């Protein structure tokens, strides 16, 4: 506040009148942002008046504070009202601009578009069907036994906690919304004759945030093969063929040791993406490994006779780096304009 400016009713009222006039003149949200900065931000007349209260004698501070505070409140209320009015006007203008006359006869039929996640899941399934695998399905509402116990999850494993898993009432039913598609693999081992080569895709549910890189409901693709004599070499060869078919020539995988309850040994699956939008690089994609003998025993299979490998990865994540999708929320919000850019092929 300058030394020549005093906190008087007239100086405060002048600052308020200037702010109100600017607010009234603002024609859109961008103009209102400028007004808000000029009349309420640090360095504005009202802000200078408010800062000047500190230099007043003690017997004047209360009255001056009440005067300036009331003025700032009037300006804030006017800004809020103007902001609401502009937002309503802009929304109304958008509705008019995007209005569709449902009685008008179209000149031609518009080509439809399927959701790219559905297309990508079918593309993945086609790759494995071409290798002689079969597609498997399973329920989204799953028992704890299939989702955790039979897959070698300890009773105190963090994934069983309510902050990670959606449990379904009543509690004594021991039902959960499946947290991965691995139960489909177990059901295939229990219900099909050996050898088993199955690929499964579907929705899974976790208590994740809804943001650019996380969804509480997303899709996974998992595969399992159980036969006599299978090794990590078979797993590696299968994954190399898969990624080269899906991502193009030059794509390959890298396996890094890790731990998963249902595989032993286990590995993180990295993908070398040769056509990544930001330049070729390694990208962490999923997990894999040899099926844990305890899982085979849960399905009544002798691990001394049979061995198997399994792998899993997120479909949304694959779509993001395969097709340069920046925000995972675009896949979940149902805006047809997102799907239309893909058409019928991904």
From Swiss-Prot:
Q: Which GO terms describe its molecular function?
A: ATP binding; magnesium ion binding; phenylalanine-tRNA ligase activity; tRNA binding
The species is Leifsonia xyli subsp. xyli (strain CTCB07)
Subcellular location field: Cytoplasm
Entry superkingdom = Bacteria
Q: Which family does it belong to?
A: Belongs to the class-II aminoacyl-tRNA synthetase family. Phe-tRNA synthetase alpha subunit type 1 subfamily.
Q: Where does Mg(2+) bind?
A: 264
User: What are the leading ranks of the lineage?
Assistant: Bacteria, Bacillati, Actinomycetota, Actinomycetes, Micrococcales
* Protein name, entry field: Phenylalanine--tRNA ligase alpha subunit
Pfam families per the record?
Answer: Phe_tRNA-synt_N, tRNA-synt_2d
């Amino acid at each position: 506040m300058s030394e020549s400016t005093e906190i008087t009713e007239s100086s405060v009222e002048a600052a308020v009148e200037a702010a109100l006039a600017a607010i009234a003149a603002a024609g859109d949200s961008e103009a209102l942002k400028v007004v808000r900065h000029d009349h309420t931000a640090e360095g504005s007349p009202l802000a200078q008046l408010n800062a000047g209260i500190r230099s007043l004698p003690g017997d004047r501070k209360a009255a001056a504070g009440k005067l300036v505070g009331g003025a700032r409140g009037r300006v804030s209320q006017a800004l809020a009202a103007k902001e609401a009015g502009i937002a309503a006007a802009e929304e109304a203008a958008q509705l008019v601009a995007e209005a569709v006359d449902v009685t008008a006869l179209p000149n031609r039929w518009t080509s439809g578009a399927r959701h790219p996640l559905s297309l990508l899941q079918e593309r993945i399934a086609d790759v494995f069907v071409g290798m002689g695998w079969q597609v498997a399905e399973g329920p989204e509402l799953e028992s704890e036994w299939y989702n955790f116990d039979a897959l070698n999850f300890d009773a105190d494993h963090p994934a069983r906690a309510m902050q990670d898993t959606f449990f379904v009432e009543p509690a004594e039913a021991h039902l959960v919304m499946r947290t991965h598609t691995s139960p489909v693999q177990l059901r295939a081992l229990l219900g099909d004759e050996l050898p088993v080569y199955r690929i499964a895709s579907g929705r899974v549910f976790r208590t994740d945030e809804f943001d650019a890189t996380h969804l509480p409901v997303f899709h996974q693709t998992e595969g399992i093969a159980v036969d006599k004599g299978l090794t990590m070499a078979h797993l590696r060869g299968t994954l190399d063929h898969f990624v080269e078919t899906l991502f193009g020539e030059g794509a390959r995988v890298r396996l890094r040791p890790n731990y998963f309850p249902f595989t032993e040994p286990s590995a993180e699956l990295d993908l070398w993406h040769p056509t990544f939008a930001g330049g070729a690089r390694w990208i962490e994609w999923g997990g894999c490994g040899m099926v844990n003998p305890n899982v085979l025993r849960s399905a009544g299979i002798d691990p001394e006779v049979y061995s198997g490998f399994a792998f899993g990865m997120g479909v949304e994540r694959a779509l993001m780096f395969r097709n340069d999708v920046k925000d995972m929320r675009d896949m979940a919000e149902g805006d047809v304009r997102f799907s239309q850019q893909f058409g019928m092929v991904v």
